[in-house]
């Protein structure tokens, strides 16, 4: 069986994802499609708009054969770690190829850039650090350094979201010598960050902002649309405000209100530097006095919110996306030591499958080198971070909609 891997979030599944799936099967000649999908929290540093089981069902009913979960530590990490984690999973599940979207659509150019970045990793780190130390943003610094190593047009590829991830997938393949052949599919329709619907291939960003619109069904495959319409418990970034608030106050109390101890504690989380930690301390102290941090008022009612706090504490050197991921990791309690966990205890967590996907699982079960998990009760220690993230997500849903969400211990893989 030939297997193509797809690294996804399906947040939610839409026409562009169906195009990607069909094109991937056509280009690679694969028999089986395996989606490595983020769980209940996604790479942009937000909760997913729908829970992972609903999104798995949307994918399987649209033609994906097997969905496995990208461990949460990778799912809410930088593009480099996100891609590295996804490729680890695809390697363990014995994928022959990976097909990913890109604005470039040119695998040769993307591969050449990935090789250059791998060959000059130490130089890149040192030169980028020099620029950021002088107040230049990370993205702008990287652009300048890569342009010196290549040329303006090549460096410009790293200004587009999908190209950035594409290069990171290729870097992971190069560094680890994975026997996974890469293919790229040129992105169709609206751009990744478009907030308005402009074509039949609307961005997931635009769709999340228009989920209650009457005409949204035309941008989502029929079966996926029926699943979407039957589940309206949508979760948005600001819905995690209370969970973040509780976590920050917990760190503050554990620090006995000592600023230096608080800063030391939050700097254990990826992407939190001393300046960001200091701003978080002030915000946490303001919460104690029920004072909304100046500049952190939400647009709706002036109250503190996740989104407004992210905007408040971001800096020129540290972009908003990085701040959001840092705060989500704090909310979930995923400090730096948690990043080592999957490297030491790898696994494949199955979220769902159709008949072909089930046949493939049976085919590889005896030869796969890591636990292939369909029943989590036997692996609860190994899956602790993923289970904890799901529990927090389910508590948010229950608090917002007054409904009981069944956790990971109750819900088995989705079967289609």
Residue ranges: model-predicted function:
Residues 1-55:
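N-terminal catalytic cores of NTP/NDP-binding nucleotidyl/phosphoryl-transfer enzymes
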Residues 8, 42-43, 59, 73-74, ...:
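Short, contiguous strand/loop micro-motifs
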Residues 28-30, 64, 95:
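Short, high-confidence coil segments that cap the C-terminus of an alpha-helix
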């Amino acid at each position: 069986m030939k297997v193509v891997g797809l690294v996804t979030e399906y947040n939610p599944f839409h026409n562009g994802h169906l195009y990607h799936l069909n094109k991937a099967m056509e280009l690679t000649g694969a028999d089986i499609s395996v989606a490595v999908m983020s769980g209940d929290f996604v790479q942009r540093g937000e909760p997913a708009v729908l829970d992972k089981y609903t999104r798995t069902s949307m994918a399987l009913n649209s033609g994906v054969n097997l969905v496995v979960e990208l461990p949460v530590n990778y799912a809410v990490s930088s593009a480099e770690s996100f891609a590295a984690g996804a490729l680890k999973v695809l390697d363990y599940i014995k994928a022959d190829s990976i097909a990913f979207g890109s604005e470039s659509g040119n695998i040769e150019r993307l591969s050449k850039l990935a090789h250059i970045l791998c060959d000059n990793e130490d130089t890149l780190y040192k030169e980028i650090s020099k620029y950021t130390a002088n107040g230049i943003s990370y993205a702008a610094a990287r652009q300048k350094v890569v342009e010196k190593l290549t040329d303006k047009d090549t460096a410009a590829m790293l200004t587009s979201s999908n190209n950035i991830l594409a290069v990171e997938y290729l870097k992971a393949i190069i560094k680890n010598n994975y026997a996974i052949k890469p293919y790229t599919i040129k992105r169709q329709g609206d751009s990744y960050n478009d907030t308005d619907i402009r074509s039949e291939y609307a961005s997931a960003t635009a769709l999340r902002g228009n989920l209650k619109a009457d005409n949204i069904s035309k941008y989502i495959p029929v079966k996926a649309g029926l699943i979407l319409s039957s589940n309206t418990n949508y979760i948005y970034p600001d819905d995690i405000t209370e969970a973040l608030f509780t976590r920050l106050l917990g760190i503050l109390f554990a620090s006995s209100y000592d600023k230096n101890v608080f800063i030391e504690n939050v700097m254990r989380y990826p992407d939190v530097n001393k300046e960001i930690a200091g701003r978080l301390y002030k915000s946490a102290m303001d919460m104690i006095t029920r004072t909304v941090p100046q500049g952190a008022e939400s647009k709706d009612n002036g109250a503190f919110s996740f989104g407004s706090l992210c905007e408040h504490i971001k800096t020129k050197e540290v972009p908003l996306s990085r701040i959001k991921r840092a705060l989500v990791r704090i909310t979930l309690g995923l400090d730096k030591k948690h990043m080592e966990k999957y490297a030491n205890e790898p696994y494949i967590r199955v979220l769902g499958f159709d008949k072909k996907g089930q046949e493939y699982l049976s085919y590889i079960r005896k030869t796969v080198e890591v636990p292939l998990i369909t029943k989590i009760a036997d692996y609860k220690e190994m899956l602790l971070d993923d289970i904890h993230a799901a529990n927090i997500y389910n508590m948010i849903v229950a608090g917002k909609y007054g409904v009981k969400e069944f956790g990971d211990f109750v819900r088995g893989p989705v079967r289609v």
